[in-house]
Amino acid sequence: KARDMGITLLVVTNGASNDTSKKRDQLSSLGLEFSNDEIISSRDAAEVFLSFNKPEGPLGVLGNIGNKFTIPDLECVELEQDYSIFEEMSSFILLGTTMWDTMWQDMLLNSLKDNPRPLFVANPDIVAPHENKFSIEPAYFISHLIANGAHLPFWLGKPFPTIFELALN
């Protein structure tokens, strides 16, 4: 009904592990119909931000479970649990924590402490509600990195401006 009245509807979400089509399908399964253009995710915000603010050298991608994370003219490397690969990265982006564990946490912390580099965090949530539980989200783990000596990251999702600027455009 809102659309019939000329009201623009947007979903602004911190979901970054998957691409927009997965979020659209998830909303559709709940009876909520949105087009890809009506969904603005923190993954979208990260892609736009990094397209205009490309870090030098390869970007290590952490927490991606959806389609490949790509930025034009930037080497994006899906990281595995191999510390030597971490050392080859010039910066990192954390998309989500679905598969995160203490090994990932320790490798990222040690890599950033040994060689400080930019860390971009697409999803700045600490926890997220689900039907029967709460999930632990990237900001929870990042807070432990900071407490243990890692530099502050670049936050790209809600409540930070990048995602809202994207939604308003």
Regions found by a protein language model. Give the residues of each.
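HAD-like aspartate-dependent phosphatase fold
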Residues: K1-N169
